[in-house]
């Protein structure tokens, strides 16, 4: 681990790119996998209660996506800026941005919690709850909302630490919270007989623990410390957060809208269809955690080296991540196609309708899985190097621009099969859009390299 900002700068701009990305990606991948695992563990434990509880967790997931969107907005918006400024060795600006992003997220998270609790029943219905699912949704959501400010602030701390090149410190905070959740959830659900309320309480307690640990970790390893006196809500900083964070807000916000629309579309075919699609969402998140974690290992490398004008290292890192991600997702897709029923059955074995819907949707997902490597890594690069328009277009495509029309069109013509195949169809269209958006930027960096070489020679 590195113990000063200067050490981090030298490390991130001189270490061979594949080794550097791998070293940064491993703790991030562990964080992502453990977080996804505890999401799946929640689904597994709640699935032991009944189908309605499983569906309720899937419905509330869309609200958690909105909360995450706020956290990622401020975390990525401030983190991208911090990595570029540290790459340019402008530490004071980076320190002010760190505190500004953190306190904005904390205040807005608290406001969201209050609003959600005031309108709990209308919100639960709007998210797609059927009359039989509504009581479970209200119980689960009412507790989850209490953890909102801790969740948004934790995501900011996690991303800021990671963008400074100290992913291992970020991992400790995230993994510790996830482990607490996995241990606490079955105790509260079954031993204390709290049911779905126990699952929600375990999640909130784990979020508070992560928040405290990340605050502590943020004071170690040469990381920028959060101080209220550095809170600088100036127009310049707000514009930087908007520019760097809008792609994340768009991506996560549309993911939430997509989940709501998916639940509403699936709800036409019964509670089992909602539960089946909810399980597939959690499985996909777990597999994608590797790719996202690997891409997040690339982001500090991308930000520091782009800020330092080392464009060849940015391009090298991009292609390395795309290749590794493609082959990993290809292996997962091939292996998963033959065992879709068995995978879904882990979460809801006693309900054949849930298994049938989930297995069909999972197979459709696997068909386009390898294309996700290009989409995800492209989006992360565009966002980190401050290409907000391209990054926002790409981030809005997968679960907005393409998914939203498809979730209305495909079920109309194909029924339940249209619901099951919707995400795969959207992924295919997003891949074709991502090619020109990314290739233009890669070519631009290559031109800048040539100009630098020409200047050195002259």
Language-model features: locations:
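Short alpha-helical transmembrane segments in multi-pass integral membrane proteins
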Residues: 1-25, 82-149, 191-246, 302-368, ...
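N-terminal transmembrane alpha-helices
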Residues: 12-44, 48-49, 65-77, 81, ...
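Transmembrane helical elements of multi-pass membrane transporters/channels
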Residues: 23-42, 143, 177, 206-210, ...
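Transmembrane alpha-helix boundary and packing residues in multipass membrane permease domains
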Residues: 28, 32, 44, 61, ...
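Helix-terminus/linker motif at the lipid-water interface of multi-pass membrane proteins
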Residues: 33, 37-55, 124-131, 187-194, ...
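Small-residue-rich hydrophobic transmembrane alpha-helices
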Residues: 54-114, 151-170, 276-340, 372-394
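Hydrophobic transmembrane alpha-helices of multi-pass small-molecule transporters
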Residues: 66-69, 181-185, 210-215, 286-289, ...
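Short runs within selected transmembrane alpha-helices of multi-pass transporters and secretion channels
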Residues: 75, 144-162, 170-181, 199-212, ...
């Amino acid at each position: 681990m590195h113990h000063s900002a200067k050490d981090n700068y030298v490390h991130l701009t001189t270490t061979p790119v594949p080794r550097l990305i791998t070293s940064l990606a491993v703790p991030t991948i562990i964080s992502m996998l453990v977080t996804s695992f505890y999401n799946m563990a929640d689904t597994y434990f709640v699935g032991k209660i009944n189908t309605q509880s499983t569906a309720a967790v899937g419905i509330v997931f869309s609200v958690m996506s909105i909360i995450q969107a706020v956290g990622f907005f401020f975390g990525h918006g401030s983190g991208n800026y911090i990595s570029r400024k540290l790459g340019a060795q402008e530490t004071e600006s980076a320190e002010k941005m760190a505190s500004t992003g953190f306190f904005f997220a904390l205040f807005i998270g608290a406001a969201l919690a209050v609003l959600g609790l005031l309108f709990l029943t209308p919100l639960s219905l709007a998210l797609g709850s059927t009359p039989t699912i509504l009581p479970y949704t209200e119980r689960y959501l009412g507790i989850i909302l209490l953890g909102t400010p801790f969740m948004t602030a934790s995501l900011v701390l996690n991303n800021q630490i990671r963008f400074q090149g100290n992913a291992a410190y970020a991992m400790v905070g995230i993994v510790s919270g996830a482990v607490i959740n996995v241990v606490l959830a079955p105790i509260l659900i079954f031993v204390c007989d709290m049911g779905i309320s126990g699952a929600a309480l375990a999640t909130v307690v784990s979020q508070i623990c992560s928040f405290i640990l990340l605050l502590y970790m943020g004071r170690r390893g040469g990381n920028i410390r959060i101080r209220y006196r550095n809170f600088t809500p100036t127009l310049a900083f707000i514009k930087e957060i908007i520019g760097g964070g809008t792609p994340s807000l768009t991506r996560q916000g549309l993911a939430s809208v997509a989940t709501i629309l998916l639940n509403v579309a699936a709800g036409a075919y019964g509670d089992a269809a909602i539960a089946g699609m909810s399980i597939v969402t959690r499985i996909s998140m777990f597999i994608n955690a590797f790719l996202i974690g690997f891409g997040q290992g690339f982001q500090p490398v991308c930000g520091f080296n782009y800020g330092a004008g080392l464009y060849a290292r940015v391009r090298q890192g991009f292609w390395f991540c795309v290749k590794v991600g493609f082959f990993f997702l290809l292996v997962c897709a091939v292996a998963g196609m033959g065992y879709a029923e068995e995978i879904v059955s882990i979460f809801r074995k006693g309900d054949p309708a849930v298994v049938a819907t989930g297995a069909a949707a999972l197979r459709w997902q696997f068909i386009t899985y390898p294309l996700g490597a290009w989409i995800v890594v492209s989006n992360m690069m565009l966002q980190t190097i401050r290409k907000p328009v391209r990054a926002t277009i790409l981030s809005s495509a997968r679960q907005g621009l393409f998914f939203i029309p498809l979730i209305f069109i495909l079920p109309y013509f194909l029924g339940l099969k249209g619901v099951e195949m919707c995400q795969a169809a959207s992924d295919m269209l997003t891949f074709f859009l991502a090619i020109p958006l990314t290739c233009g930027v890669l070519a631009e960096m290559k031109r800048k390299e040539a100009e630098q070489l020409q200047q050195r020679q002259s």
